[in-house]
From Swiss-Prot:
The gene is rpsU. GO terms for molecular function: structural constituent of ribosome. Belongs to the bacterial ribosomal protein bS21 family. Residues 37-58 are annotated as: Disordered. Disulfide bonds: none annotated. It comes from Chlamydia trachomatis serovar D (strain ATCC VR-885 / DSM 19411 / UW-3/Cx). Residues 43-58 have a biased composition (Basic residues). Pfam families: Ribosomal_S21 (PF01165). Keywords: Ribonucleoprotein, Ribosomal protein. GO terms for cellular component: ribonucleoprotein complex; ribosome. This is Small ribosomal subunit protein bS21. GO terms for biological process: translation.
């Protein structure tokens, strides 16, 4: 779990920005979105092959 220590006199906006950057880096938000609903294995396989085709097209 990422945490940010806010120093005295440090703006809250900066601390929130740092926290958001840490969350993005660890991929917490992405995994929580993927676990939000159940995806059938066939749907996962189709999405994976579509992403691979998109990657190969570069």
């Amino acid at each position: 779990m990422p945490s940010v220590k806010v120093r005295v006199g440090e703006p809250i906006d900066r601390a929130l920005r740092i926290l958001k950057k840490k969350i993005d880096k660890e991929g917490i938000l992405k995994t929580s979105k993927s676990h939000r609903f159940y995806d059938k294995p066939s749907v996962k396989k189709r999405a994976k092959s579509k992403a691979a085709a998109k990657y190969r097209g570069r």
